């Protein structure tokens, strides 16, 4: 299959002619306009900057998504959520989340690493524009009274960083056309990224968003309710969402 070389023009070739893993183009840049064009067509960049100093563009024809209403919360996760050990916020520490993701499995240093300075700058700019968002998971020490409030469901949506807390996990991604495009997640303690994903799904369900784009299947995401759809089904939902917003 051909891999297209992009130039400075704002365009993408038809991704249906790409490699089986979704790679179909190399080059261009990580400008805001190009990234928005990419995501509106289900295209996302990986920047293997230690191997090639140009973005690699992917668009798998087999898409792995989670529909917010279908998020699976296991019994053990429900127990963890009732314990009050963790507090969830949104857009309170985007920098901390993306840096945490970049350090996971040496995503910023290994050969083929993709989450390096160029990617971080681009998504930080998208965050400042209100397009990229983060979910943060904080480990906190609560009083017995605060724990009781958590168990009763109180304060779950408080978007305030508690005192004596540390960032132990989270995720970030792009909100566009009624969908959330997950980019990366990290955990410093067991299940922190699962907590972030559950919170995200609940948030998106309230906003009537169609799906969370997980990019590729993993056992972790499969256990949370992820499933496969075709690229045509994927784009039909994105386009319908875009038309509904007009």
Task: Please identify what each model-predicted range represents.
Residues 1-246:
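N-acyltransferase acceptor-side catalytic subdomain
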């Amino acid at each position: 299959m051909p891999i297209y070389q992009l130039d400075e023009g704002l365009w993408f070739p038809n991704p249906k002619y790409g490699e089986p893993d979704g790679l179909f183009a190399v080059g261009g840049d990580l400008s805001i306009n190009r990234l928005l064009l990419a995501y509106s067509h289900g295209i996302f960049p990986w920047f293997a900057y230690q191997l090639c100093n140009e973005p690699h563009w992917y668009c798998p024809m087999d898409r792995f998504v989670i529909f917010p209403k279908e998020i699976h919360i296991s019994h053990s996760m429900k127990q963890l959520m009732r314990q009050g050990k963790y507090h969830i916020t949104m857009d309170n520490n985007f920098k901390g989340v993306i840096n945490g993701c970049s350090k996971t499995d040496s995503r910023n240093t290994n050969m083929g690493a993709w989450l390096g300075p160029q990617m971080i700058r681009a998504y930080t700019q998208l965050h400042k524009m209100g397009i990229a968002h983060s979910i943060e998971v904080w480990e906190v020490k609560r009083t017995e009274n605060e724990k009781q409030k958590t168990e009763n469901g109180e304060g779950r949506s408080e978007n305030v960083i508690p005192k004596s807390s540390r960032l132990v996990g989270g995720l970030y991604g792009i909100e566009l056309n009624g969908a959330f495009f997950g980019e990366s997640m990290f955990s410093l303690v067991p299940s922190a990224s699962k907590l972030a994903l559950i919170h995200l799904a609940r948030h998106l369900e309230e906003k009537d968003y169609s799906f969370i784009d997980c990019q590729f299947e993993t056992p972790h995401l499969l256990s949370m309710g992820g499933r496969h759809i075709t690229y045509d089904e994927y784009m039909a939902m994105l386009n319908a969402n875009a038309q509904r917003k007009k």
